[in-house]
């Protein structure tokens, strides 16, 4: 079991911790968050408005966070370079503050004794890995990696299956995306991106996303062939990708369904899901897949031009992939 520290006990930090407790390959030994004290950590970990109460025990004892009887060391450092990960036995660090996303900034964790850092966000310069798509390209000379974004983790497995079978000439992605913590509850100031500052609960907000372009980094053959945007909508969790693409080889919609289903039951099992049910977003809350293809929602204009729909729990599915990536990396030590 690889010993892991978590930096930033926000949505992803807490859910990575939850996911780790239902996985036997990753052992959370330390958590750092300068803004949340120990007793507050107990409360925030135990109660979750989106995913429900933690199914286990959590308490504070002797200055440690104790989850299911397992004591976890707590740090409250603002500067990553000052966190003594080594003293706590943490070999890997999940960088989930959303702040230290470059090689240089995330690299500060190595100073405190961590051996590797996994950034739980897209990174401008760290190599990005998406489980089921390019994780096998990881080699253990890499000390800092990124698990890309939740949307890239939804789009890339689907794009891979379609491209491998039919070839994608070009495509546009739209993600209809749930609210996240960076948004505002009511209208407020938002730096350069004025629309992002509008009230999250009362608007559909067009927003940028690098998720589609990032697919070109994890599937090099698709580089320059995909781009996309987002609509932020007033739901607390679960998002949906619409991939509209031109196919190289003509395909009936039933052919597409067939290959996606095969991938979901085979090589991409647990990562890509497949459903023919009449589902809506709530049906995917706390779903651990990166992406679930909605066979009944897609449409084809003709044999070369299709719109494909895939759901994802942007919090929990993604957090499970962070854990999977760490387990995979540990298997290569």
From Swiss-Prot:
Activity regulation details: Glyceraldehyde-3-phosphate dehydrogenase activity is inhibited by fumarate, via the formation of S-(2-succinyl)cysteine residues.
Active site positions, chain numbering: 150 (nucleophile)
Modified residues (S-nitrosocysteine): 150, 245
Key word Oxidoreductase present: yes
PTM annotation: S-nitrosylation of Cys-150 leads to interaction with SIAH1, followed by translocation to the nucleus. The effect of S-nitrosylation on enzymatic activity is unclear: according to some authors, it inhibits enzymatic activity and increases endogenous ADP-ribosylation, inhibiting the enzyme in a non-reversible manner. According to others, it does not affect glycolysis. ADP-ribosylation is likely to be a pathophysiological event associated with inhibition of gluconeogenesis.
Pathway named in the protein's UniProt entry: Carbohydrate degradation; glycolysis; pyruvate from D-glyceraldehyde 3-phosphate: step 1/5
Alphabetical list of SUPFAM superfamilies matching this protein: Glyceraldehyde-3-phosphate dehydrogenase-like, C-terminal domain (SSF55347), NAD(P)-binding Rossmann-fold domains (SSF51735)
Similarity field: Belongs to the glyceraldehyde-3-phosphate dehydrogenase family.
Identification of the protein by name: Glyceraldehyde-3-phosphate dehydrogenase
């Amino acid at each position: 079991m690889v010993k892991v520290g978590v930096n930033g006990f926000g949505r992803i930090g807490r859910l990575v911790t939850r996911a780790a407790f239902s996985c036997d390959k990753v052992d959370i030994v330390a958590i750092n968050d300068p803004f949340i004290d120990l007793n507050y950590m107990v409360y925030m970990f135990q109660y979750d408005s989106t995913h429900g109460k933690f199914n286990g025990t959590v308490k504070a004892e002797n200055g440690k966070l104790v989850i299911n009887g397992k004591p976890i060391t707590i740090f409250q450092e603002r500067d990553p370079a000052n966190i003594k990960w080594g003293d706590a036995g943490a070999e890997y660090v999940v960088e989930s503050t959303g702040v230290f996303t470059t090689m240089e900034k995330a690299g500060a964790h190595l100073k405190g004794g961590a051996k590797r850092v996994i950034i739980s966000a897209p990174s401008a310069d760290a190599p990005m890995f998406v489980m089921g798509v390019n994780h096998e390209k990881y080699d253990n000379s890499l000390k800092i990696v990124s698990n890309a974004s939740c949307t890239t983790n939804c789009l890339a497995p689907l794009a891979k299956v379609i491209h491998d079978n039919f070839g994608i000439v070009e495509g546009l992605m739209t993600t209809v995306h749930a609210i996240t913590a960076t948004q505002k509850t009511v209208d407020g100031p938002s730096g350069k991106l004025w629309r992002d500052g509008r009230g999250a609960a009362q608007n559909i907000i067009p927003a940028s996303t690098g998720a589609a372009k990032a697919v070109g980094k994890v599937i090099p053959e698709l580089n320059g062939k995909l781009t996309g945007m987002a609509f932020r909508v007033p739901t607390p969790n679960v998002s949906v990708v619409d991939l509209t693409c031109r196919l190289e080889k003509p395909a009936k919609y039933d052919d597409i369904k067939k290959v996606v289903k095969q991938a979901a039951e085979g090589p991409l099992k647990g990562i890509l899901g497949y459903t023919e049910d009449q589902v809506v977003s709530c049906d995917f809350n706390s779903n651990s897949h990166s992406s679930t293809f909605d066979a009944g929602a897609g449409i084809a204009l003709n044999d070369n031009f299709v719109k494909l729909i895939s759901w994802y729990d942007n919090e929990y599915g993604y957090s499970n992939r962070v854990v999977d990536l760490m387990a995979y990396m540990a298997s290569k030590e």
